[in-house]
Amino acid sequence: HSMRYLSIIGTAICCVMLVMTSVSCKQETLSSTTQEKKVAPWYVYIDGSSFKDIEPVKEIISSISVFGNPPKSFIDECHQNHIEVYQAVGGNEETVDTPQKRKALVEKYVSDCNANGYDGIDLDLEHLSPDIQDAYTEFLKLASKELHAVGKKLSHCVSFYPALYQDNETKMFHDPAVLNTTCDLVRVMCYDMYFAPGIDKPELKHRDDCMGIGPTSNYLWTREAMLFWMKHIPNDKLVMALPAYANDYAVTGGIKGRQIYQSVPDSINGILPSPTWLCYEKVNMYLYDGCLLYTSDAADD
């Protein structure tokens, strides 16, 4: 990930809020006596972090995927509140390109889960070469087998790059059919439709999400992302990941972009907008140089 922080209470807690698609498609009534937990955020554990960060929203959180190294006491407290905890891990092509590396890595996953009490591993490997697909398939099969053997789960973050919108047969580094048979959860990252920090990076010019200026996401693109993955993964395994940040561009001179993780002052009176829990409604803001013109193509409702 490029770091995606969402400030829920005071300090930065979550990178992205996640909603089960199988829940979002249901008709729910206010009279329902059973409230199903629906939110599964990524959580960045840093110095000063504690379960107190999560306390205000613990009743709606089903699981968290943790970047960093929380103490076992933190994981235990999550379990006491019926929250599953995944260890978020990254990597690249060289991480899994030989049988020896794959075996050692999976052994480490199992060891970390058993030692710290994690409920599973959340794989966040992104933008790998499609040429690695065969090796990655073997990696997924091994990770799934060994984690499930000790009662742990396997989660995977997936994207919907613009190329998939144009060609559903685009080869990826992970085979969707293999993800379906090996993973317990598949988290669809409905963001980085445009990756603002990559707009001026020559080494990223080949990436679809760095070809031009645009929003982090929008509703129609998110819908297409979910529809694509629903063709490959059952709804009860899918998680819809929504961005808690916006793209910010300076477009005079050399174009540069960045990601912003908090509300910006009104350009006229300098006052921050009222806090809102609906962070997704503000994901499409832009900055046009010094004039501070912010726009959004998100729907009002």
Protein language model regions, located:
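Gly/Pro-rich active-site loop or hairpin
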Residues: 198-227, 283, 288-296
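Glycan-binding loop/region signatures in secreted carbohydrate-active enzymes
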Residues: 237-296
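Bacterial N-terminal signal peptides
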Residues: 11-21
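Chitinase-like catalytic core of GlcNAc-active glycosidases
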Residues: 35-214, 218
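Bacterial N-terminal signal peptides that target proteins for export
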Residues: 2-10
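A short, hydrophobic C-terminal helix/tail in secreted or cell-surface proteins
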Residues: 297-301
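Bacterial Sec-dependent N-terminal signal peptides
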Residues: 21-36
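Active-site region of glycoside hydrolase catalytic domains
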Residues: 187-188, 194, 220-253
